[in-house]
Amino acid sequence: MWCARSNAEVRVELTKGWKSGALLKPYTGYDASLLALNDELSDELLYAAHLIQIPDLEQQPSDCGEDEDGAGDGHDETDSFAEMIANIYTLDRACGVCQVLSEYRKKFPLKVEWMADYALLCHKTQAAPLCATTTFVTAFEFAFIMDKHYLPAHGASMVGEFGRRNLFLADVQKHFFLNGCFTPVEGGLVSKIDLNNYSFLVQSVARYAVTSFEGAKSSSWQPNCGAAGQQARHAPAGHGKQMAWAGGATVATRGPGDSTWNSPKTSSTAVALLKWREYARPLECFGKRRHRGLKRSAADADSAGAISMTCVQVAEAEDFARERELVDRAEYPAAQCAAGAAMQCPSKWRFADLTALLMAGTASLPARVAESSGATECPIHEIAAARQATVREYHDRVAEVIMSEQNDRGREPPRFWGRAAKPAAALGPILASVLPHPNGRGGTGGECLLCNLMLTEDYWRAIRLLKSKVVGREDTNTSLFDGVQPSVDQFEEYANTADGGRMLTLLKSVGPNAIYKHLFCDPLCAINALRISPDVLWGSPPSDPEAAELYKAELAARPNFSERVCRGVWILAFAFKAYQLAPPRPTALSTFIRSAESYLKRHGLNCIALEHALTRYV
């Protein structure tokens, strides 16, 4: 409810970038309209998603100078910053978000209203796909609820904490997704050890993703310039070491056997990956183990005891039931915004616009320009250029303030704030990814476009329609891949998203390989689709303000936060992504594939030959 406020309250909001009255807006969780309430915070989070490059004194000068995309001139390195980020993904590193919450509890009185909003955010994060867009939105909304309850009354703000690197997007991922620090646990020490083992494995894979780029760059990276650089941009995908174009920088990807698992820095991760089945066993959803570890709601427990179904089967049944309900009501999500009136409700598509901003010009969403047309620009390229400009401007502005503060104190500026430090803008905002790396292979990148789009309900439904069209396109034994492009070409005939052409433009830009990978090949994509709980993500809280507050209060009073997919399946997905970045030798690869396929089938989840996706895509 909007009400008159003092000029002092308004000034406090404006000094932190919030639009007047923004902090009075009721919090409903994963609300796309919130992104328009603070442009400064949006720029800050975009900047926080980038690596920082500093001069490499050991690097020999390059003959070709700085490339046109600003990726570096051969004298800069991102390894040091990547190592700092990698150290966040460790069990013996305190969670940054937990530390923030602890500091607030020490300094300020605990507010019941804040507890309710925080509980809703935690609840929603367990029903959202793991992707860059979700990370960004979660960080933004965490800052929103903290400022909503503590900025007007106490002058405490989260705006600027990410930009000054007091908090990292990796902390957000660790708190809300990789570890789930707020999740109640039952079963005592044994269950906590099992969950810590899970956290160790998934964080180790995230850590390896960052350091795998570091290793690839230090061993074979070269500045992309001249004819050699142009050849690298268009190098075909295949086996063995190859070069992939990632937002203007050339990075190496690896083929089977070209692994780095024997180095001291990755040996513990290598051992954990070999033990993935042992880590998964106590946390999987089979038989008696279903109730061990994470505390589940009474409804979940009753359902699990009545019907012997895996988490995958339960999730699929819930999704089909929701679709039937929408059909019966004639309330398809696409009908919520009339055709031709997309621009009348632009806030509805802000998540899609954010996805384009985060992925444009990277290996996950390349800027495709037909050379025969003579064109030099395309929408994806323009979005990427705007993002890079925003990131560089933010860095220059904040770095100037920090260096001035340090000069006043007679100190040298921190290592990553010196005059020679600059954001690796050409690599893109890879730190928003749960597995942060810029590698590309086979027309795919580290971020899946379709996983990101599923954060919007209309797109979740449209992707399910797209998959059904691909599957049902031919009655003959044609390849599923052959049905992707025709189904995309006819997309507007069966998926009336009324989004101003956003989704279709993105689907055409990403290409059929990335779509095929998401729909049929990659276990992480398949599990991401199942992780989305429509009733939680889009069906709560109630639209009535009083009912919504009661709903949030009940969540805070009985915090049974759990996702639909068991952690055993997630362990498999992260192990798969690790081997996708650096496939093991054929014997080890064969052993893993057989075990993984058996595990997926036992859950009722079918994917096309895992060895194809593991060696062909990334």
From Swiss-Prot:
Compartments (UniProt record): Host cytoplasm; Host nucleus
Q: Which GO terms describe its cellular component?
A: host cell cytoplasm; host cell nucleus; viral envelope
Please verify whether the record's keywords include Metal-binding: yes
Which Pfam families would you find in this protein's record?
Herpes_env (PF01673)
Record region (Zinc finger 2): 448-525
> Which residue ranges are recorded for the region named Zinc finger 1?
95-181
Residues involved in Zn(2+) 1 binding: 95, 98, 175, 181
The UniProt GO MF terms for this protein read: zinc ion binding
Q: What does this protein do?
A: Plays a role in efficient localization of neo-synthesized capsids to nuclear replication compartments, thereby controlling cleavage and packaging of virus genomic DNA.
Quote the protein name from its UniProt record.
Answer: Packaging protein UL32
Q: Which organism is it from?
A: Psittacid herpesvirus 1 (isolate Amazon parrot/-/97-0001/1997) (PsHV-1)
